[in-house]
């Protein structure tokens, strides 16, 4: 089972980097599947996500990879990559605006000596010298800037995927150059981009520029496996303009019904209109200083027609994860300065709360199966004049981001008169051209959307899409469920969680590092520690239930469960008695602590025992066997337990959220290793992998086949002391083979000996791991 996971990396079905597989294992369950689609054209994939039920479609969601299309001549739109997929044609593409740009892509097969070939370019016969002494294909980009000039060789793309790209964007045409898998883009400027027309002589795909990262991936690593099959039939480009008859998708479906309640599924089209708001503060005095320019929440109310129904909608737009910039022109009172201005970019999010007066939102209290699909939108910044008393005004201009749908949750909006349950749509951001700058200052070439003039004169930005959810509503349509009974309102709990996170992180400076190291070196795990948390003994029963319930749904638990389900079957020959023994010892340690607490009843101890019993099973399935060694969960649990003991306001409601969050976020930089004889093979979550000898710590070539076999048949060990630390320790202090093996196995006794000897290298490594534990 386990070998299947890794052997798929080596088959022809698909190709991924080892880092991709490691990230997948550490985050969520995903699987690439190659499907034989049959003799049908795969031009337009259905723009819908299928769950246990389907979100019906009436609004087109733009596909990432649209095609393949037959060779044709047309004027491609701006902001779309043309992904060219030739077979053996010599001339791949010709593009010109007949004024200042003529560009042609020529395909040259591998192993061609220097020779002159005859090509027909733009109706003219040309002799061009080509050469390809590699085993890959080469795309020669030929260029001229006037009709009377000769073609010059401008760029070369050396490719083993035999794919090329062409894009019209921002007064330039863009192509790929370099060598795969590290090819990148470059451009040629033109004064008349809109008139550039192309003659494409090969099959091609169309990809939105917002998905340029996927285009880059295809160029460098090849098309997805579904596209590399003879059953994919190219169609004419005109198929993109086929008019489809709109189906009825704004519908109400009764899922189930009793005498008092019924379940209704609402499928709706949606148009979200929103705008940004900002706050610009100017200091008094001479009038040259601006202390703050920031984003503020913005409300917008509008009407639109949904399938013949007039809908009044309300949105509230807010931003999160703003980046603070500043500009200081000098120290004098007459020097222009902005102390802080906010910019949103890739690490930011935009939230849109949406509510309308339709039947779907009337009883939106008990909700399940919520799903949505939305298009993307580009938001461009405008100009803002800093009006100063004397001198030329600095002008902020430019900046743009694209918003991409990243999720939807339920929310509650409060006004002075009413509280409304609404949908909160979350959008991730990518930066776009042009960059922003402040005229007459040195601020230029920065990317993102600043808070100066984010709407750029637009009354609103608009996003179209659809959503669907199932509500439990009264059978009597005239009755409205009281909003105060809503199960979606969690403001108080969120506030407690926020306060608790801040308290946890501030406690880090107050906890002695030696105390944490001693605790981390005990055989401990995330669940058996509960019996030793003094502040939660009285609430052990409800707390244990809630923690297990929440952890079961966490991303870490899901990935561990899926991974170990396959690995444990394959590694059945590995003895697990040592791991069980480790768990029993850890349970006894913390049970002793709990028994010292006065006033704890037998029933509480029984609950603690039950929780510890559950932990035995979870510990066995953490990643694979640990063979008497310490793992990353031990350190996480030690830090968490120490902080919980010192925390002042732990409650049974907030603890499960903190436990679950810490298990997923603590120690993000992890590494794992397998050991065979005198050779160690180590991989980390960043995708780095290497092998080395135990005796000399000399690196040896990383054998993927051997790694596959070892993962199948051997325990996977947490690399508490990583290779870099081991090498440093050996170079500076010298360690025996026995010590090296114990450190590689993360033996707690040996680690404690090194720390008791005040070894700075080992101690520093443990401290670095503990310092990663932040919420």
Swiss-Prot record:
GO terms for cellular component: host cell endoplasmic reticulum-Golgi intermediate compartment; host cell plasma membrane; host cell rough endoplasmic reticulum; host cytoskeleton; membrane; viral outer capsid. It comes from the Viruses. HAMAP family: Rota_A_VP4, Rota_VP4. Disulfide bonds join 317-379. InterPro entries: ConA-like_dom_sf (IPR013320), Rota_A_VP4 (IPR042546), Rota_VP4_MID (IPR035330), Rota_VP4_MID_sf (IPR038017), VP4_concanavalin-like (IPR000416), VP4_helical (IPR035329). This is Outer capsid protein VP4. Residues 247-478 are annotated as: Spike body and stalk (antigen domain). Belongs to the rotavirus VP4 family. Residues 388-408 are annotated as: Hydrophobic. The record marks 230-231, 240-241, 246-247 as: Cleavage. Transmembrane segments: none annotated. A motif (DGE motif) lies at residues 307-309. Residues 509-775 are annotated as: Spike foot. GO terms for biological process: permeabilization of host organelle membrane involved in viral entry into host cell; virion attachment to host cell.
């Amino acid at each position: 089972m386990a070998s299947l996971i890794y052997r798929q990396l080596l088959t022809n079905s698909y190709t991924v980097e080892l880092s991709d597989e490691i990230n997948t294992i550490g985050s969520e369950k995903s699987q690439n599947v190659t499907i034989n689609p049959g003799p049908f054209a795969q031009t337009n994939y259905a723009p819908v996500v299928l769950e246990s039920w389907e979100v019906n479609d009436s609004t087109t969601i733009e596909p990432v990879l649209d095609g393949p299309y037959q060779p044709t001549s047309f004027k491609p739109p701006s902001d779309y990559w043309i992904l060219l997929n030739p077979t053996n044609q010599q001339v791949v593409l010709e593009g010109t605006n007949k004024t200042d740009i003529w560009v042609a892509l020529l395909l040259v097969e591998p192993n061609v000596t220097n020779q002159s070939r005859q090509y027909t370019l733009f109706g003219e016969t040309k002799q061009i010298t080509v050469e390809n002494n590699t085993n890959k294909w080469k795309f020669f980009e030929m260029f001229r800037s006037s009709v009377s000039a000769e073609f010059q060789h401008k760029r070369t793309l050396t490719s083993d995927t035999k794919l090329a790209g062409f894009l019209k964007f921002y007064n330039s045409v863009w192509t790929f150059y370099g060598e795969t898998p590290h090819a990148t883009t470059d451009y040629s400027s033109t004064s008349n981009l809109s008139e550039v027309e192309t003659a494409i002589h090969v099959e091609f795909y169309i990809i939105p520029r917002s998905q340029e990262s996927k285009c880059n991936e295809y160029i460098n690593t090849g098309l997805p496996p579904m596209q590399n099959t003879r059953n994919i039939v190219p169609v004419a480009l005109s198929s993109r303009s086929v008019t489809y008859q709109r189906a009825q998708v704004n519908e109400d479906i009764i899922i189930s019904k009793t005498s008092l309640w019924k379940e209704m599924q609402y499928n709706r089209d949606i148009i979200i209109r929103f705008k940004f708001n900002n706050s610009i503060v100017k200091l008094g005095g001479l009038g040259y200083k601006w202390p703050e320019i920031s984003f503020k929440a913005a409300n917008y109310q509008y009407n639109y027609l949904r399938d013949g129904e007039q809908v009044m909608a309300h949105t509230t737009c807010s931003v999160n994860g703003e980046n603070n910039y500043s500009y200081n022109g000098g120290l004098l009172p007459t020097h222009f300065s902005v102390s802080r201005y906010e910019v949103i970019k890739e690490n930011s999010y935009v939230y849109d709360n949406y509510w309308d007066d339709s039947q779907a939102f009337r009883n939106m209290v008990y909700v399940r199966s919520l799903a949505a699909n939305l298009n993307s939108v580009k938001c461009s910044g405008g100009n803002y004049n800093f009006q100063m008393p004397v001198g030329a005004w600095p002008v902020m201009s430019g900046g743009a981001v694209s918003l991409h749908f990243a999720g939807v949750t339920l929310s509650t909006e409060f006004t002075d008169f009413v509280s409304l349950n609404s949908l909160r749509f979350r959008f991730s951001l990518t930066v776009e051209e042009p960059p922003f700058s402040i005229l007459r200052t040195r601020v230029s070439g920065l990317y993102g959307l600043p808070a100066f003039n984010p709407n750029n004169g637009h009354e609103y930005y608009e996003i179209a899409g659809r959503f669907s959810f199932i509500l439990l509503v009264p059978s009597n349509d005239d009755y409205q469920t009281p909003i105060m009974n809503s199960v979606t309102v969690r403001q108080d709990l969120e506030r407690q969680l926020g306060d608790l996170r801040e308290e946890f992180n501030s406690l880090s400076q107050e906890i002695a590092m030696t105390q944490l190291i001693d605790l981390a070196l005990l055989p401990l795990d995330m669940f058996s520690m509960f019996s030793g948390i003094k502040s939660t003994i009285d609430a052990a029963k409800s707390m244990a239930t809630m923690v297990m319930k929440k952890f079961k749904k966490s991303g870490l638990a899901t990935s561990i469960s899926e991974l170990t389900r396959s690995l444990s079957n394959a590694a059945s020959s590995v003895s697990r008695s040592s791991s069980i023994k480790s768990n029993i010892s850890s349970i006894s340690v913390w049970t002793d602590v709990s028994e010292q607490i006065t006033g704890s009843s037998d029933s509480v101890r029984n609950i603690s025992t039950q929780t510890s019993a559950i932990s035995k099973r979870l510990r066995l399935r953490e990643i694979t066997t640990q063979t008497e060694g310490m793992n990353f969960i031990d350190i996480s649990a030690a830090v968490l337990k120490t902080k919980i003991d010192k925390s002042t306001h732990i409650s049974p409601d907030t603890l499960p959220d903190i436990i679950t969050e810490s298990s997923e976020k603590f120690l993000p930089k992890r590494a794992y290793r397998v050991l065979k004889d005198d050779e160690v093979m180590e991989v980390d979550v960043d995708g780095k992998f290497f092998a080395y000898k135990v005796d000399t710590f000399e690196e040896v070539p990383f054998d993927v086949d051997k790694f596959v076999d070892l993962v199948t048949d051997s325990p996977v060990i947490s690399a508490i002391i990583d290779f870099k630390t081991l090498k440093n320790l050996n170079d500076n202090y010298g360690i025996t083979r026995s010590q090296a093996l114990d450190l590689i196995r993360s033996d707690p006794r040996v680690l404690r000996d090194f720390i008791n000897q005040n070894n700075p290298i080992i101690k520093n490594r443990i401290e670095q791991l503990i310092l990663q534990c932040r919420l």
